[in-house]
């Protein structure tokens, strides 16, 4: 996007601050383990945790492994977070019974696809099904569409998950992330 702005004679937009804010909120919440499937929407947050010697970052082969890993972390006395994209939520549905039935906290931060401004029709079904699927499994869901509300939403979700031993997901909408543009992606 910065290159497109530059070619139109506009100043590039400043980097958003919410990824750094999420990092600090999660550190303050005692997060020591990060389970993730690589995702561009989480890239700055992932890099921050990878650079943190106090945090263990585990790259998963599939998202549901993170649910089990974080249940184990909790049983071992540590807090963790699962970072994933909405398209990976479908992979977690059966495994979500673990924290629900066993009354374990689970904090998930989900970057959304398939909503506002989406260009890829293949992302729409799971993007639209993410919230109802999570709620059907007993997960408390908070969606945020304003960058200024990201940190406080994640903070509230972390408190809710770890104080009540419930699974909680924060959905970061495409208004926060920025909708991808196929024409711009094709030029890169």
Spell out what each predicted region is.
Residues 2-188:
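Thiamine diphosphate
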């Amino acid at each position: 996007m910065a290159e497109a702005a530059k070619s139109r004679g506009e100043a590039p937009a400043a980097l958003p601050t919410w990824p750094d804010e999420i990092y600090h909120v999660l550190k303050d919440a005692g997060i020591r383990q990060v389970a993730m499937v690589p995702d561009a929407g989480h890239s700055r947050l992932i890099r921050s945790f990878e650079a943190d010697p106090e945090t263990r970052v585990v790259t998963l082969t599939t998202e549901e492994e993170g649910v089990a890993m974080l249940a184990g972390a909790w049983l071992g006395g540590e807090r963790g977070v699962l970072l994933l994209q909405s398209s990976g939520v479908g992979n977690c549905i059966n495994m979500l019974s673990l924290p629900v039935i066993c009354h374990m906290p689970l904090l998930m931060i989900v970057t959304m696809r398939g909503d506002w401004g989406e260009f890829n029709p293949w992302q729409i079904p799971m993007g639209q099904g993410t919230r109802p699927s999570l709620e059907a499994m007993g997960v408390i869901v908070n969606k945020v569409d304003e960058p200024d509300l990201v940190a406080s939403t994640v903070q509230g979700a972390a408190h809710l998950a770890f104080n009540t031993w419930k699974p909680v997901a924060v959905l970061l909408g495409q208004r926060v992330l920025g909708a991808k543009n196929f024409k711009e992606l094709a030029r890169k």
